[in-house]
Amino acid sequence: MQSERRRKILEIVQETGGRSVTELCEQFDVSEMTIRRDLRDLDREGLLRKVHGGAVSNLGRSYEPPYAVRTTRNDEKKRAIGRMAASLVEDGDSLALDVGTTTLEIAHALQGKRNLTILTASLPIANEIVANLSLTTEVRLILTGGIVRSGELSMIGSIAARTYSDFHVDKAFIGVGGISLDAGLTEYNLEDAMVKKPMIQNAQQRIVVADSSKVGRTTFTAVAPLTVANTLITDSDIDRTMVNALEDLGIEVMIAKEGD
């Protein structure tokens, strides 16, 4: 009962942009204390923003849910995307693995690959590689360096961007905040976007990995036009008209199915 009410509260706030405690009490016929507790817990999960007297949606273009929250969202879809992306990696490849929860799933799925060089600005990805792959026979790991972004465990700043500028890789696996026909590839954070740009520029093959919730969305800052992408790997919930539009631009769309 509680979880269903909170799910509906979240839907209402996201659809309308915001609701007062009084309005939600009337709609669900519960006490103010109950609604305030629901809003507090939803805020702690990063699903909405609690304000004085109510709550507002956090789906603005500059708001990105915390990393710890994103790791629990669409996790089965992300795992499927990660497996499909890893299947494109060949022994001997040099890779750039972007920061993010979907690219982390690629690192999970790289076991069995040999003689890889992996460049990343992500501490969770580096930790995954160190823990589960042999750095002597299978992987050479390069961290970009830079300033660690609090809460994200990723590296940003001129050092990180310059490192990507100094290396040319076979394949870059790119995570983004949004993919739209009008705005192209976009991100929530300007500093993240500045690090992604040289990574994309210096990759021979550019593979965007994003669950379908990112498709059709525009976030805060531009990263690159859509046409830089050779491939998009996403899940089966993507709108078919968007698939057709992307393919018309020459972008291969690969659908990762859960359980494959």
Where are these regions (language model features)?
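Conserved phosphate- and dinucleotide-binding cores of soluble alpha/beta proteins
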Residues: E4-L24, D29-E32, D43-R44, K50, ...
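Minor-groove-contacting beta-hairpin "wing" of winged helix-turn-helix DNA-binding domains
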Residues: G53-G60
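Short glycine/proline- and acidic residue-enriched helix-loop micro-motifs
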Residues: E64-T72, L143-G145
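Helix-turn-helix/homeodomain-like alpha-helical modules used for DNA recognition
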Residues: V69-G112, I118-T120
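A residue-level structural signature of the nucleotidyltransferase/glycosyltransferase Rossmann-like core
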Residues: T117-I118, K171
